[in-house]
Amino acid sequence: MLWFQGAIPAAIASAKRSGAVFVVFVAGDDEQSTQMAASWEDEKVTEASSNSFVAIKIDTRSEACLQFSQIYPVVCVPSSFFIGDSGIPLEVIAGSISADELVTRIHKVRQMHSLKGEASLANGSQSEGSVSTPSASFEHNNTSENCQSRNVELCETPSTSDTKSDSATGGESSGQTTVSQEPSGCSNQRPTEDLTVRVERLTKKLEERREEKRKEEEQREIKKEIERRKTGKEMLDYKRKQEEELTKRMLEERNREKAEDRAARERIKQQIALDRAERAARFAKTKEEVEAAKAAALLAKQAEMEIKRETSTKERSTVARIQFRLPDGSSFTNQFPSDAPLEEARQFAAQTVGNTYGNFSLATMFPRREFTKEDYKKKLLDLELAPSASVVLLPAGRPTTSMVHSSSGDFWTLLGTVLYPFLAIWRLISNFLFSNPPPAQTSVRAASLETSNLASSSNSEKREPVRKRVLEKRGEDFKKEGKIYRLRTQDDGEDENNTWNGNSTQQM
Protein backbone atom coordinates (compact mmCIF):
# COMPACT_ATOMS: atom_id res chain seq x y z
CA MET A 1 0.00 0.00 0.00
CA LEU A 2 1.25 3.41 -0.97
CA TRP A 3 0.74 5.59 2.11
CA PHE A 4 0.62 9.35 1.92
CA GLN A 5 3.64 10.80 3.72
CA GLY A 6 2.23 14.23 4.54
CA ALA A 7 -0.30 15.51 7.04
CA ILE A 8 -4.07 15.01 6.95
CA PRO A 9 -4.92 18.45 5.38
CA ALA A 10 -2.42 17.83 2.60
CA ALA A 11 -3.87 14.38 1.99
CA ILE A 12 -7.43 15.82 1.84
CA ALA A 13 -6.33 18.48 -0.65
CA SER A 14 -4.62 15.86 -2.79
CA ALA A 15 -7.74 13.67 -2.77
CA LYS A 16 -9.97 16.61 -3.84
CA ARG A 17 -7.65 17.59 -6.65
CA SER A 18 -7.56 14.10 -8.05
CA GLY A 19 -11.19 13.27 -7.23
CA ALA A 20 -10.04 10.22 -5.28
CA VAL A 21 -11.38 8.57 -2.17
CA PHE A 22 -9.66 9.64 1.05
CA VAL A 23 -8.67 6.57 3.14
CA VAL A 24 -7.68 6.89 6.82
CA PHE A 25 -6.24 3.81 8.58
CA VAL A 26 -6.14 4.20 12.39
CA ALA A 27 -3.76 1.58 13.83
CA GLY A 28 -2.57 0.73 17.30
CA ASP A 29 -0.06 -1.62 18.95
CA ASP A 30 -2.38 -4.61 19.34
CA GLU A 31 -2.47 -7.82 17.34
CA GLN A 32 -5.54 -6.86 15.25
CA SER A 33 -3.82 -3.66 14.12
CA THR A 34 -0.83 -5.71 13.04
CA GLN A 35 -3.03 -8.12 11.10
CA MET A 36 -4.97 -5.26 9.43
CA ALA A 37 -1.72 -3.53 8.51
CA ALA A 38 -0.53 -6.77 6.93
CA SER A 39 -3.79 -6.93 4.93
CA TRP A 40 -3.23 -3.36 3.68
CA GLU A 41 0.32 -4.25 2.66
CA ASP A 42 -0.87 -7.19 0.59
CA GLU A 43 -0.12 -7.00 -3.16
CA LYS A 44 -3.78 -7.51 -4.11
CA VAL A 45 -4.86 -4.63 -1.92
CA THR A 46 -2.07 -2.45 -3.26
CA GLU A 47 -3.07 -3.24 -6.83
CA ALA A 48 -6.80 -2.64 -6.14
CA SER A 49 -6.16 0.71 -4.42
CA SER A 50 -3.51 2.00 -6.78
CA ASN A 51 -5.92 4.39 -8.55
CA SER A 52 -8.61 6.67 -7.13
CA PHE A 53 -7.36 6.31 -3.49
CA VAL A 54 -5.25 8.59 -1.27
CA ALA A 55 -4.44 6.62 1.91
CA ILE A 56 -2.85 7.85 5.14
CA LYS A 57 -1.89 5.83 8.23
CA ILE A 58 -2.11 7.40 11.70
CA ASP A 59 -1.34 6.09 15.17
CA THR A 60 -3.88 6.17 17.98
CA ARG A 61 -1.39 7.99 20.23
CA SER A 62 -0.63 10.75 17.73
CA GLU A 63 -2.10 14.25 17.69
CA ALA A 64 -3.45 13.68 14.16
CA CYS A 65 -5.61 10.83 15.48
CA LEU A 66 -6.91 13.10 18.23
CA GLN A 67 -7.91 15.79 15.71
CA PHE A 68 -9.44 13.22 13.36
CA SER A 69 -11.47 11.63 16.17
CA GLN A 70 -13.07 14.99 16.95
CA ILE A 71 -14.82 14.91 13.54
CA TYR A 72 -15.06 11.18 12.90
CA PRO A 73 -15.38 9.22 16.12
CA VAL A 74 -12.91 6.37 16.35
CA VAL A 75 -14.86 3.72 18.20
CA CYS A 76 -12.68 0.70 17.53
CA VAL A 77 -8.99 0.16 16.86
CA PRO A 78 -8.00 -0.65 14.16
CA SER A 79 -10.44 1.27 11.93
CA SER A 80 -10.40 2.11 8.23
CA PHE A 81 -12.38 5.12 6.94
CA PHE A 82 -13.26 5.59 3.21
CA ILE A 83 -14.35 9.26 2.90
CA GLY A 84 -15.85 10.70 -0.27
CA ASP A 85 -15.63 14.17 -1.82
CA SER A 86 -18.40 15.60 0.38
CA GLY A 87 -16.68 14.46 3.60
CA ILE A 88 -19.17 11.69 4.23
CA PRO A 89 -17.73 8.22 5.00
CA LEU A 90 -18.49 5.82 2.17
CA GLU A 91 -17.30 2.78 4.15
CA VAL A 92 -16.00 2.17 7.65
CA ILE A 93 -14.16 -1.05 8.44
CA ALA A 94 -13.89 -1.75 12.16
CA GLY A 95 -11.43 -4.35 13.32
CA SER A 96 -9.26 -6.63 11.23
CA ILE A 97 -10.33 -8.43 8.02
CA SER A 98 -8.53 -10.55 5.47
CA ALA A 99 -6.90 -9.19 2.33
CA ASP A 100 -9.51 -10.73 -0.01
CA GLU A 101 -12.39 -9.17 1.91
CA LEU A 102 -10.54 -5.88 1.95
CA VAL A 103 -10.19 -6.02 -1.84
CA THR A 104 -13.95 -6.65 -2.11
CA ARG A 105 -14.66 -3.65 0.09
CA ILE A 106 -12.34 -1.49 -1.99
CA HIS A 107 -14.19 -2.47 -5.18
CA LYS A 108 -17.53 -1.61 -3.57
CA VAL A 109 -16.22 1.76 -2.42
CA ARG A 110 -14.86 2.42 -5.91
CA GLN A 111 -18.26 1.58 -7.42
CA MET A 112 -20.05 3.83 -4.95
CA HIS A 113 -17.60 6.63 -5.66
CA SER A 114 -18.06 6.25 -9.41
CA LEU A 115 -21.86 6.20 -9.12
CA LYS A 116 -21.69 9.24 -6.90
CA GLY A 117 -19.57 11.01 -9.47
CA GLU A 118 -22.05 10.26 -12.30
CA ALA A 119 -25.02 11.36 -10.23
CA SER A 120 -23.28 14.58 -9.26
CA LEU A 121 -22.80 15.44 -12.92
CA ALA A 122 -26.48 14.80 -13.68
CA ASN A 123 -27.89 16.32 -10.52
CA GLY A 124 -26.26 18.01 -7.53
CA SER A 125 -28.42 16.06 -5.15
CA GLN A 126 -27.04 12.75 -6.34
CA SER A 127 -24.41 12.89 -3.59
CA GLU A 128 -27.02 12.47 -0.90
CA GLY A 129 -28.54 9.37 -2.48
CA SER A 130 -25.16 7.81 -2.94
CA VAL A 131 -24.51 7.75 0.78
CA SER A 132 -27.43 5.43 1.55
CA THR A 133 -25.81 2.49 -0.17
CA PRO A 134 -22.53 2.57 1.80
CA SER A 135 -24.45 3.14 4.97
CA ALA A 136 -26.59 0.09 4.29
CA SER A 137 -23.58 -1.95 3.36
CA PHE A 138 -21.77 -0.71 6.47
CA GLU A 139 -24.70 -1.79 8.60
CA HIS A 140 -24.78 -5.18 6.89
CA ASN A 141 -21.07 -5.81 7.28
CA ASN A 142 -20.72 -4.83 10.92
CA THR A 143 -23.58 -6.64 12.62
CA SER A 144 -21.17 -9.18 14.09
CA GLU A 145 -19.09 -6.65 16.03
CA ASN A 146 -20.10 -4.24 18.73
CA CYS A 147 -17.74 -1.50 17.63
CA GLN A 148 -18.96 -1.63 14.01
CA SER A 149 -22.63 -1.36 15.09
CA ARG A 150 -21.84 1.94 16.79
CA ASN A 151 -20.43 3.34 13.57
CA VAL A 152 -23.55 2.20 11.71
CA GLU A 153 -25.70 4.32 14.03
CA LEU A 154 -23.56 7.34 13.27
CA CYS A 155 -23.85 6.72 9.54
CA GLU A 156 -27.62 6.08 9.53
CA THR A 157 -28.40 9.66 10.46
CA PRO A 158 -27.37 11.23 7.14
CA SER A 159 -29.10 8.44 5.21
CA THR A 160 -32.36 9.09 7.05
CA SER A 161 -32.13 12.80 6.43
CA ASP A 162 -31.51 12.13 2.76
CA THR A 163 -34.60 9.94 2.56
CA LYS A 164 -36.75 12.56 4.24
CA SER A 165 -35.53 15.29 1.94
CA ASP A 166 -36.24 13.11 -1.08
CA SER A 167 -39.79 12.30 0.10
CA ALA A 168 -40.51 16.00 0.76
CA THR A 169 -39.58 16.94 -2.79
CA GLY A 170 -41.56 14.01 -4.21
CA GLY A 171 -38.51 11.89 -5.11
CA GLU A 172 -38.08 8.10 -4.68
CA SER A 173 -35.18 6.33 -2.87
CA SER A 174 -33.87 2.87 -3.71
CA GLY A 175 -31.84 0.28 -1.62
CA GLN A 176 -28.50 1.08 -3.23
CA THR A 177 -28.78 4.57 -4.91
CA THR A 178 -31.30 7.43 -4.86
CA VAL A 179 -31.87 9.62 -7.92
CA SER A 180 -33.49 12.98 -7.23
CA GLN A 181 -36.25 14.28 -9.54
CA GLU A 182 -36.19 17.89 -8.30
CA PRO A 183 -35.60 20.80 -10.60
CA SER A 184 -32.06 21.96 -11.12
CA GLY A 185 -32.57 25.19 -9.17
CA CYS A 186 -33.36 23.42 -5.92
CA SER A 187 -30.54 20.87 -6.36
CA ASN A 188 -27.89 23.58 -6.25
CA GLN A 189 -28.89 24.81 -2.77
CA ARG A 190 -29.70 21.46 -1.18
CA PRO A 191 -26.17 20.03 -0.77
CA THR A 192 -25.05 23.02 1.25
CA GLU A 193 -28.10 22.94 3.50
CA ASP A 194 -27.96 19.18 3.93
CA LEU A 195 -24.26 19.34 4.74
CA THR A 196 -24.91 21.95 7.45
CA VAL A 197 -27.72 19.88 8.91
CA ARG A 198 -25.57 16.80 8.80
CA VAL A 199 -22.70 18.56 10.49
CA GLU A 200 -25.03 19.78 13.23
CA ARG A 201 -26.48 16.35 13.64
CA LEU A 202 -23.04 14.80 13.68
CA THR A 203 -21.94 17.34 16.24
CA LYS A 204 -24.97 16.55 18.36
CA LYS A 205 -24.32 12.87 17.94
CA LEU A 206 -20.71 13.40 18.93
CA GLU A 207 -21.80 15.28 22.03
CA GLU A 208 -24.25 12.53 22.88
CA ARG A 209 -21.59 9.93 22.33
CA ARG A 210 -19.19 11.89 24.48
CA GLU A 211 -21.84 12.15 27.19
CA GLU A 212 -22.48 8.45 26.89
CA LYS A 213 -18.75 7.84 27.04
CA ARG A 214 -18.50 10.03 30.12
CA LYS A 215 -21.38 8.18 31.77
CA GLU A 216 -19.91 4.88 30.75
CA GLU A 217 -16.58 6.03 32.10
CA GLU A 218 -18.24 7.01 35.36
CA GLN A 219 -20.00 3.68 35.53
CA ARG A 220 -16.74 2.00 34.71
CA GLU A 221 -14.99 3.99 37.44
CA ILE A 222 -17.75 3.06 39.89
CA LYS A 223 -17.41 -0.57 38.91
CA LYS A 224 -13.64 -0.30 39.20
CA GLU A 225 -14.00 1.28 42.65
CA ILE A 226 -16.43 -1.46 43.67
CA GLU A 227 -14.07 -4.07 42.29
CA ARG A 228 -11.15 -2.37 44.00
CA ARG A 229 -12.96 -2.30 47.32
CA LYS A 230 -14.06 -5.87 46.85
CA THR A 231 -10.53 -6.86 45.93
CA GLY A 232 -9.18 -4.91 48.91
CA LYS A 233 -11.65 -6.61 51.21
CA GLU A 234 -10.75 -9.98 49.75
CA MET A 235 -7.08 -9.14 50.16
CA LEU A 236 -7.68 -8.11 53.78
CA ASP A 237 -9.63 -11.29 54.39
CA TYR A 238 -6.89 -13.28 52.72
CA LYS A 239 -4.20 -11.55 54.77
CA ARG A 240 -6.22 -12.04 57.94
CA LYS A 241 -6.66 -15.71 57.13
CA GLN A 242 -2.96 -15.99 56.40
CA GLU A 243 -2.14 -14.28 59.69
CA GLU A 244 -4.55 -16.56 61.53
CA GLU A 245 -3.04 -19.60 59.84
CA LEU A 246 0.45 -18.31 60.60
CA THR A 247 -0.52 -17.68 64.22
CA LYS A 248 -2.11 -21.11 64.41
CA ARG A 249 0.99 -22.71 62.92
CA MET A 250 3.19 -20.77 65.32
CA LEU A 251 1.05 -21.88 68.26
CA GLU A 252 1.13 -25.46 67.05
CA GLU A 253 4.88 -25.22 66.57
CA ARG A 254 5.28 -23.69 70.01
CA ASN A 255 3.07 -26.34 71.61
CA ARG A 256 5.00 -29.02 69.77
CA GLU A 257 8.31 -27.56 70.95
CA LYS A 258 6.96 -27.37 74.50
CA ALA A 259 5.82 -30.97 74.28
CA GLU A 260 9.24 -31.99 72.97
CA ASP A 261 10.97 -30.00 75.71
CA ARG A 262 8.69 -31.56 78.30
CA ALA A 263 9.39 -35.02 76.94
CA ALA A 264 13.12 -34.26 76.88
CA ARG A 265 12.97 -33.05 80.49
CA GLU A 266 11.09 -36.17 81.49
CA ARG A 267 13.70 -38.31 79.77
CA ILE A 268 16.45 -36.39 81.50
CA LYS A 269 14.69 -36.74 84.86
CA GLN A 270 14.28 -40.46 84.30
CA GLN A 271 17.93 -40.74 83.32
CA ILE A 272 18.94 -38.75 86.40
CA ALA A 273 16.77 -40.99 88.58
CA LEU A 274 18.36 -44.07 87.03
CA ASP A 275 21.83 -42.61 87.52
CA ARG A 276 21.02 -41.77 91.12
CA ALA A 277 19.67 -45.25 91.72
CA GLU A 278 22.78 -46.80 90.19
CA ARG A 279 25.02 -44.44 92.11
CA ALA A 280 23.10 -45.16 95.32
CA ALA A 281 23.42 -48.88 94.68
CA ARG A 282 27.13 -48.52 94.02
CA PHE A 283 27.49 -46.26 97.04
CA ALA A 284 25.53 -48.68 99.22
CA LYS A 285 27.68 -51.52 98.02
CA THR A 286 30.82 -49.48 98.51
CA LYS A 287 29.54 -48.27 101.87
CA GLU A 288 28.85 -51.82 102.98
CA GLU A 289 32.33 -52.80 101.90
CA VAL A 290 33.81 -49.77 103.64
CA GLU A 291 31.79 -50.45 106.77
CA ALA A 292 32.83 -54.08 106.68
CA ALA A 293 36.45 -53.00 106.26
CA LYS A 294 36.04 -50.47 109.07
CA ALA A 295 34.43 -53.08 111.28
CA ALA A 296 37.26 -55.49 110.54
CA ALA A 297 39.83 -52.79 111.20
CA LEU A 298 38.01 -51.82 114.40
CA LEU A 299 37.94 -55.40 115.54
CA ALA A 300 41.62 -55.76 114.75
CA LYS A 301 42.34 -52.52 116.56
CA GLN A 302 40.27 -53.59 119.54
CA ALA A 303 42.06 -56.90 119.60
CA GLU A 304 45.38 -55.11 119.42
CA MET A 305 44.29 -52.73 122.16
CA GLU A 306 43.17 -55.66 124.27
CA ILE A 307 46.52 -57.27 123.75
CA LYS A 308 48.28 -54.03 124.63
CA ARG A 309 46.02 -53.56 127.62
CA GLU A 310 46.68 -57.07 128.79
CA THR A 311 50.38 -56.56 128.22
CA SER A 312 50.35 -53.26 130.07
CA THR A 313 48.23 -54.79 132.81
CA LYS A 314 50.68 -57.60 133.14
CA GLU A 315 53.55 -55.13 133.16
CA ARG A 316 51.77 -53.02 135.73
CA SER A 317 50.92 -56.03 137.79
CA THR A 318 54.59 -56.88 138.06
CA VAL A 319 55.54 -53.39 139.30
CA ALA A 320 53.92 -51.30 142.03
CA ARG A 321 54.56 -47.58 141.99
CA ILE A 322 54.17 -46.16 145.50
CA GLN A 323 54.02 -42.43 146.32
CA PHE A 324 54.99 -41.60 149.89
CA ARG A 325 53.45 -38.38 151.24
CA LEU A 326 55.15 -36.78 154.25
CA PRO A 327 53.42 -34.80 156.97
CA ASP A 328 54.98 -31.55 155.73
CA GLY A 329 53.28 -31.96 152.35
CA SER A 330 56.29 -33.15 150.40
CA SER A 331 56.41 -36.53 148.72
CA PHE A 332 58.67 -38.99 146.98
CA THR A 333 58.01 -42.00 144.76
CA ASN A 334 59.57 -45.40 144.27
CA GLN A 335 58.76 -48.61 142.41
CA PHE A 336 58.60 -52.02 144.06
CA PRO A 337 57.80 -55.49 142.80
CA SER A 338 54.11 -56.17 143.11
CA ASP A 339 54.76 -59.33 145.10
CA ALA A 340 57.03 -57.48 147.57
CA PRO A 341 55.69 -57.12 151.16
CA LEU A 342 54.59 -53.77 152.52
CA GLU A 343 57.44 -53.98 155.02
CA GLU A 344 59.91 -53.41 152.19
CA ALA A 345 58.15 -50.19 151.25
CA ARG A 346 58.16 -49.09 154.93
CA GLN A 347 61.87 -49.76 155.21
CA PHE A 348 62.52 -47.71 152.06
CA ALA A 349 60.53 -44.83 153.52
CA ALA A 350 62.40 -45.11 156.84
CA GLN A 351 65.72 -44.99 155.03
CA THR A 352 64.60 -41.99 153.03
CA VAL A 353 63.22 -39.82 155.88
CA GLY A 354 65.60 -41.10 158.51
CA ASN A 355 64.70 -40.22 162.09
CA THR A 356 62.80 -37.09 161.16
CA TYR A 357 59.46 -38.52 162.15
CA GLY A 358 60.65 -41.20 164.50
CA ASN A 359 58.51 -44.27 164.59
CA PHE A 360 55.81 -43.94 161.91
CA SER A 361 53.18 -46.04 160.29
CA LEU A 362 51.68 -46.16 156.78
CA ALA A 363 48.11 -45.38 155.79
CA THR A 364 45.98 -44.66 152.71
CA MET A 365 43.51 -41.80 152.52
CA PHE A 366 41.20 -43.13 149.82
CA PRO A 367 39.92 -45.45 151.06
CA ARG A 368 40.98 -44.40 154.55
CA ARG A 369 43.02 -47.24 155.99
CA GLU A 370 45.92 -47.47 158.41
CA PHE A 371 48.09 -50.53 157.94
CA THR A 372 48.81 -52.73 160.95
CA LYS A 373 51.72 -55.03 161.69
CA GLU A 374 49.91 -57.93 160.04
CA ASP A 375 49.52 -55.88 156.85
CA TYR A 376 53.27 -55.29 156.62
CA LYS A 377 53.76 -58.96 155.88
CA LYS A 378 51.26 -58.98 152.98
CA LYS A 379 52.15 -58.33 149.38
CA LEU A 380 51.52 -55.01 147.74
CA LEU A 381 49.30 -56.70 145.15
CA ASP A 382 47.16 -58.21 147.87
CA LEU A 383 46.82 -54.84 149.58
CA GLU A 384 45.65 -53.32 146.25
CA LEU A 385 48.68 -51.05 146.13
CA ALA A 386 49.66 -52.26 142.65
CA PRO A 387 50.17 -50.99 140.05
CA SER A 388 50.16 -47.56 141.81
CA ALA A 389 49.11 -46.13 145.16
CA SER A 390 49.59 -43.16 147.46
CA VAL A 391 50.69 -43.85 151.04
CA VAL A 392 50.83 -41.35 153.90
CA LEU A 393 53.48 -41.49 156.61
CA LEU A 394 51.87 -41.15 160.04
CA PRO A 395 54.31 -40.41 162.91
CA ALA A 396 53.71 -42.44 166.04
CA GLY A 397 51.18 -40.85 168.48
CA ARG A 398 49.76 -38.39 165.89
CA PRO A 399 46.09 -38.79 165.02
CA THR A 400 45.01 -39.22 161.47
CA THR A 401 42.86 -36.10 161.57
CA SER A 402 45.83 -33.86 162.29
CA MET A 403 47.71 -35.44 159.48
CA VAL A 404 44.82 -34.92 157.22
CA HIS A 405 44.60 -31.32 158.34
CA SER A 406 48.27 -30.69 157.76
CA SER A 407 48.28 -32.28 154.38
CA SER A 408 44.89 -31.52 152.92
CA GLY A 409 44.67 -27.78 152.76
CA ASP A 410 41.97 -25.18 153.21
CA PHE A 411 39.13 -27.66 152.98
CA TRP A 412 40.27 -29.55 156.02
CA THR A 413 41.00 -26.29 157.80
CA LEU A 414 37.39 -25.23 157.29
CA LEU A 415 36.20 -28.65 158.37
CA GLY A 416 38.36 -28.49 161.53
CA THR A 417 36.97 -25.03 162.32
CA VAL A 418 33.42 -26.34 162.09
CA LEU A 419 34.16 -29.42 164.22
CA TYR A 420 36.35 -27.63 166.80
CA PRO A 421 33.52 -26.84 169.29
CA PHE A 422 32.44 -30.46 169.30
CA LEU A 423 36.02 -31.61 169.80
CA ALA A 424 36.47 -29.16 172.69
CA ILE A 425 33.32 -30.40 174.39
CA TRP A 426 34.47 -33.96 173.85
CA ARG A 427 37.88 -33.20 175.43
CA LEU A 428 36.26 -31.60 178.47
CA ILE A 429 33.99 -34.56 178.93
CA SER A 430 36.82 -37.03 178.42
CA ASN A 431 39.13 -35.15 180.86
CA PHE A 432 36.36 -35.01 183.44
CA LEU A 433 35.32 -38.62 183.19
CA PHE A 434 38.61 -40.35 182.54
CA SER A 435 41.94 -40.10 184.25
CA ASN A 436 44.96 -38.34 182.85
CA PRO A 437 46.79 -40.15 180.12
CA PRO A 438 49.97 -42.01 181.00
CA PRO A 439 53.15 -40.00 180.84
CA ALA A 440 54.50 -42.09 178.00
CA GLN A 441 51.59 -41.21 175.77
CA THR A 442 51.85 -37.55 176.75
CA SER A 443 55.54 -37.50 175.93
CA VAL A 444 54.86 -39.16 172.61
CA ARG A 445 52.25 -36.59 171.74
CA ALA A 446 54.53 -33.78 172.79
CA ALA A 447 57.33 -35.21 170.72
CA SER A 448 55.08 -35.60 167.73
CA LEU A 449 53.84 -32.05 168.14
CA GLU A 450 57.37 -30.77 168.36
CA THR A 451 58.44 -32.76 165.33
CA SER A 452 55.45 -31.55 163.37
CA ASN A 453 56.15 -27.97 164.35
CA LEU A 454 59.76 -28.39 163.40
CA ALA A 455 58.79 -29.99 160.09
CA SER A 456 56.32 -27.29 159.33
CA SER A 457 58.78 -24.56 160.23
CA SER A 458 61.50 -26.17 158.16
CA ASN A 459 59.09 -26.66 155.32
CA SER A 460 57.99 -23.04 155.52
CA GLU A 461 61.62 -21.96 155.59
CA LYS A 462 62.24 -24.02 152.49
CA ARG A 463 59.21 -22.57 150.78
CA GLU A 464 60.10 -18.94 151.42
CA PRO A 465 62.98 -18.67 148.92
CA VAL A 466 60.97 -20.58 146.35
CA ARG A 467 58.07 -18.15 146.76
CA LYS A 468 60.40 -15.20 146.47
CA ARG A 469 61.93 -16.59 143.30
CA VAL A 470 58.46 -17.15 141.83
CA LEU A 471 57.41 -13.60 142.67
CA GLU A 472 60.62 -12.19 141.22
CA LYS A 473 60.16 -14.24 138.08
CA ARG A 474 56.52 -13.20 137.89
CA GLY A 475 57.54 -9.59 138.18
CA GLU A 476 59.89 -10.05 135.26
CA ASP A 477 57.37 -11.87 133.05
CA PHE A 478 54.23 -9.95 133.99
CA LYS A 479 53.37 -6.29 134.30
CA LYS A 480 50.86 -5.33 136.98
CA GLU A 481 48.31 -2.64 136.24
CA GLY A 482 45.98 -2.44 139.24
CA LYS A 483 44.57 -5.92 139.75
CA ILE A 484 45.35 -6.96 136.18
CA TYR A 485 48.56 -8.69 135.12
CA ARG A 486 49.61 -8.61 131.49
CA LEU A 487 52.56 -10.07 129.64
CA ARG A 488 55.57 -7.91 129.18
CA THR A 489 56.91 -6.96 125.73
CA GLN A 490 60.11 -5.42 124.49
CA ASP A 491 58.52 -1.97 124.28
CA ASP A 492 57.32 -1.92 127.90
CA GLY A 493 60.68 -0.81 129.21
CA GLU A 494 60.90 2.00 126.69
CA ASP A 495 57.31 3.13 127.46
CA GLU A 496 58.07 3.23 131.20
CA ASN A 497 61.21 5.30 130.63
CA ASN A 498 59.54 7.77 128.26
CA THR A 499 57.80 10.94 129.38
CA TRP A 500 54.25 11.46 128.19
CA ASN A 501 52.02 14.50 128.02
CA GLY A 502 48.43 14.57 129.17
CA ASN A 503 47.11 14.09 125.64
CA SER A 504 49.01 10.80 125.18
CA THR A 505 51.82 12.42 123.22
CA GLN A 506 55.45 11.79 124.05
CA GLN A 507 57.71 14.62 125.02
CA MET A 508 60.81 15.12 122.91
UniProtKB/Swiss-Prot annotation:
Residues 122-190, 450-459, 498-508 have a biased composition (Polar residues). Residues 315-393 form the UBX domain. PROSITE patterns: UBX. Residues 460-491 have a biased composition (Basic and acidic residues). Residues 117-199, 450-508 are annotated as: Disordered. It comes from the Eukaryota. Pfam families: UBX, UBX7_N. Keywords: Endoplasmic reticulum, Membrane, Nucleus, Phosphoprotein, Unfolded protein response. It is a peripheral membrane protein. Its main location: endoplasmic reticulum. InterPro entries: Thioredoxin-like_sf (IPR036249), Ubiquitin-like_domsf (IPR029071), UBX_dom (IPR001012). The keyword Transcription does not apply. Residues 414-434 dip into the membrane without crossing it. One of its GO terms (cellular component) is nuclear envelope. SUPFAM superfamilies: Thioredoxin-like, Ubiquitin-like. Directly interacts with VCP. Interacts with UBQLN1. Forms a complex with VCP and UBQLN1. This is UBX domain-containing protein 4. It comes from Bos taurus.
